[in-house]
Amino acid sequence: MKRPTKKLNFLNFLLEFCSHETAKVRETANQIVLQMQSSGDYRDIIEEYSVMYLRFLISPTPPALLFGEDRGRPIIQEIWTEDIVKVCLYLFLSLLPKNQKLFKHLVEVYSNSKAQVHVDFGLAQGGVKPITVQRTILRELVSAVGSIPIDSPELLELVETCPPGSEVLIMRIVQVLTDKVLPTPELVDKFRNLYKDRSQDVRLLIPVLNGMKKQEVIQGKYLS
């Protein structure tokens, strides 16, 4: 595996296995790919591949590329399921804590994903019900963003440039982080500006309330 061509072929197999139906296969391939990414080998290729899979979620139906005997899904499905959405997120969310510049791709996909996901909630809760791809993204990103520093420059930029339609995603990311640590003054300021520039919906401030001045909150400055 010293020759580049052989290593690239090996990497290609690994990347394909990162979306395999069998969890053990997927996890093993993902671990090796992350090691290769951390060492700097083919970092761009790995990240571009993860973004390609992430962008599948903009499509109204799952692409045929996700199916086949070699993927552990011999039958092509024409509707999104929660498991297939998770597979498309798997590698990308593993890379996100290592490179927060990938945030911009997550925001783009979240804002443009309109498809529904069919989720089996069990007979007691009504069986199979449709939810949005966006809701699945919000649920899956929790473990991925938890290790991101609260003072991440990319996080501050994300809040500052918050594209319309991505407010809930950004609120969720920051809420996960501020469950463990206080928001920085810079982050609080970014949310204040976001509140003023948008609909002045006070819910935008919820993730950073514990970083605001007590008097500011008591006076209800943002509740009028």
How does the language model describe each region?
Residues M1-S224:
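Eukaryotic alpha-helical solenoid repeat scaffolds
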